Amino acid sequence: MEEIGIILPEKDDQVTDAKGLPFAGPQTFDELESEDLYTKYKKLQRMLEFLEVQEEYIKDEQRNLKKEYLHAQEEVKRIQSVPLVIGQFLEAVDQNTGIVGSTTGSNYYVRILSTIDRELLKPSASVALHKHSNALVDVLPPEADSSISMLQADEKPDVQYSDIGGMDTQKQEIREAVELPLTHVELYRQIGIEPPRGVLMYGPPGCGKTMLANAVAHHTTAAFIRVVGSEFVQKYLGEGPRMVRDVFRLAKENSPAIIFIDEIDAIATKRFDAQTGADREVQRILLELLNQMDGFDQTTNVKVIMATNRADTLDPALLRPGRLDRKIEFPLPDRRQKRLIFSTITAKMNLSEEVDLEEFVARPDRVSGADINAICQEAGMNAVRENRYIVLPKDFEKGYKNNIKKDESEYEFYK
């Protein structure tokens, strides 16, 4: 190589560039890779610092939002704190406002709290209103503002059919109309007929109408709702019809159920040209009752029993078939019925062998089952008064005179 003028450096000689500096030569692959990793490391480190700053910022925001949330919760609790005004939701205007009716009879255009579930705001729903602004702050459960309650299992009357003397026909008719459709509905389906929807029990006072209804409540597992007709007559307009709706709503929710309305003549008398607001309100209650009885079908398993002393005063629309299909009369007991009632009531009494109940049964006075029970109770009290453990015939005689043989002059005060 020297011959052609090229001198190769020795191995120990250092290669320099044009400036005389040592020449590094091309970088290896490992060196390039380490430089890329270092750059990535720096980028990740800067990103980590940025995320740490963001984390601190988010934590501060979270603490502030939590404080605002707790403050808002306290504000909602303060708004919903009692005492609140109970009202009735009538209509929704938009998502934030609606129309409600108060217990005073006035309607208000109010604001609806944003935390309230709009699905619960249905017409006739019970709501809570703020006492100052009347804003709608809560939706109450259906049973909260209802004066109608259902008898629980331990509250049902302890009256059995065997405790009622006589009335075999009435017992059979009410069991066919009320008990059988609830327990053996397939019998009516096989025959192809519909069971009665409602039953009317009518007759003079003291003939066992309410007692027989209590026996039905005792012997059936269905829910039993008992109300008196006068309970529907309330002070404010619209309260009576709302109570009627509550009764049937409660019965449908707990079906199979039995509704027993005692003294139905308080709200179901024949309609006339009412001149006062009270009479018109009673007629509205009757119309709501008729509407509810038409509104439920046989699949709901709801039966209605009504009792009255004055069937002649009831509105014909209530008595028509389809509403009250079966009408059961409770007349004053005849001689056979008297004997059965006396035997049933005195079965647990300690009677003397000289007592002849047939003597009192044969008397021509028209007495009711309640009168016979009063006679036996008075006879027992006479024995207690004389410190005896046995009831004698004279005790029954005194009891009979005290309850049946009344001088008409004693009732002049009531004439």
From Swiss-Prot:
Highest taxon, organism lineage: Eukaryota
Pfam families registered for this protein in UniProt: AAA, AAA_lid_3, Prot_ATP_ID_OB_C
Entry GO terms, CC: cytoplasm; nucleus; proteasome complex
Chain sites annotated for binding ATP: 203-210
Membrane-spanning segments: none
Annotated compartments: Cytoplasm; Nucleus
Keywords tagged on the record: ATP-binding, Cytoplasm, Nucleotide-binding, Nucleus, Proteasome
PROSITE patterns for this protein: AAA (PS00674)
Example GO molecular function: ATP hydrolysis activity
Biological role stated in the UniProt entry: The 26S proteasome is involved in the ATP-dependent degradation of ubiquitinated proteins. The regulatory (or ATPase) complex confers ATP dependency and substrate specificity to the 26S complex.
Protein family membership: Belongs to the AAA ATPase family.
Protein name as it appears in the record: 26S proteasome regulatory subunit 6B
